[in-house]
């Protein structure tokens, strides 16, 4: 009976450590800035790891009043580029935790 309590206490300590490490990794990921680019940097966007846009840069030559659709497409491409980088890094950083938890 005592042995079982020791195992449970040890398991709880491991879970607390895991939770602390997950939070640290998530905080670092959220603070990381990811850039998305389109058309030779005609449009560059910056996002934090928690998907908040912090900056957008549009080169003058990308602005054509007669072709608004092109600029919209460039912005979408840059945003999607940044989002895929965030998703990839999130999977690399946080995926290690779900691999160690049965059922996830």
Swiss-Prot record:
Source taxon at top rank: Bacteria
Q: Which SUPFAM superfamilies match?
A: YbaB-like (SSF82607)
User: Pfam families from the xrefs?
Assistant: YbaB_DNA_bd
Location relative to the cell: Cytoplasm, Nucleoid
| Residue spans of biased composition, Low complexity class | 1-19
Give the signal sequence positions. Answer: none
User: Which keywords label this protein?
Assistant: Cytoplasm, DNA-binding
GO molecular function term, any single one: DNA binding
Q: What are its GO cellular component terms?
A: bacterial nucleoid; cytosol
Q: Where is this region: Disordered?
A: 1-24
- Role: Binds to DNA and alters its conformation. May be involved in regulation of gene expression, nucleoid organization and DNA protection.
- Give the family, as the similarity comment puts it: Belongs to the YbaB/EbfC family.
Q: Oligomeric state and partners?
A: Homodimer.
Could you tell me what this protein is called? Nucleoid-associated protein LSL_1227
Write down the species: Ligilactobacillus salivarius (strain UCC118) (Lactobacillus salivarius)
């Amino acid at each position: 009976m005592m042995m079982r309590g020791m195992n449970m206490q040890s398991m709880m300590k491991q879970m607390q450590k895991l939770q602390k490490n997950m939070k640290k990794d998530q905080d670092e990921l959220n603070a990381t800035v990811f850039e998305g680019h389109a058309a030779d940097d005609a449009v560059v966007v910056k996002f934090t790891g928690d998907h908040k846009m912090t900056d957008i840069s549009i080169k003058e030559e990308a602005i054509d009043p007669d072709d608004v659709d092109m600029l919209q497409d460039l912005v979408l491409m840059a945003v999607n580029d940044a989002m895929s980088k965030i998703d990839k890094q999130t999977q690399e950083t946080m995926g290690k935790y779900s691999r160690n938890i049965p059922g996830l």
